[in-house]
Amino acid sequence: MKVLSSLKSAKSRHKDCQIVKRKGRVFVICKTNPRFKAVQGKKKK
C-alpha cells in the first residue's frame, strides 16, 4: 500500500478503485487489482 499526499491520480488508476474514509484516513481500495491500494492522512488520536 502506498502512502500518498494526493489521491487524485490514485483514484483514477483503475475503473474499480473506490475512495473510503476510515478512522481519519482516506483509503483507495481496488478489489480487482490490489496493487492500486493507497492511503492518505495520519491516524487521529
Swiss-Prot record:
Annotated Gene Ontology cellular components are: ribonucleoprotein complex; ribosome
Q: Which GO terms describe its biological process?
A: translation
**Keyword annotations from UniProtKB, A to Z:** Ribonucleoprotein, Ribosomal protein
Give the record's family classification: Belongs to the bacterial ribosomal protein bL36 family.
- List, alphabetically, the Pfam families matched: Ribosomal_L36 (PF00444)
Q: What gene is behind this protein?
A: rpmJ
- Is Metal-binding included in the keywords of this UniProt record? no
Domain of life of the organism in this record? Bacteria
Task: Tell me if Oxidoreductase is a UniProt keyword of this record.
Answer: no
MF (Gene Ontology): structural constituent of ribosome
Organism of provenance: Aliivibrio salmonicida (strain LFI1238)
- Its name, as the record gives it, is Large ribosomal subunit protein bL36
Question: Taxonomic classification, please?
Answer: Bacteria, Pseudomonadati, Pseudomonadota, Gammaproteobacteria, Vibrionales
Signal peptide interval? none
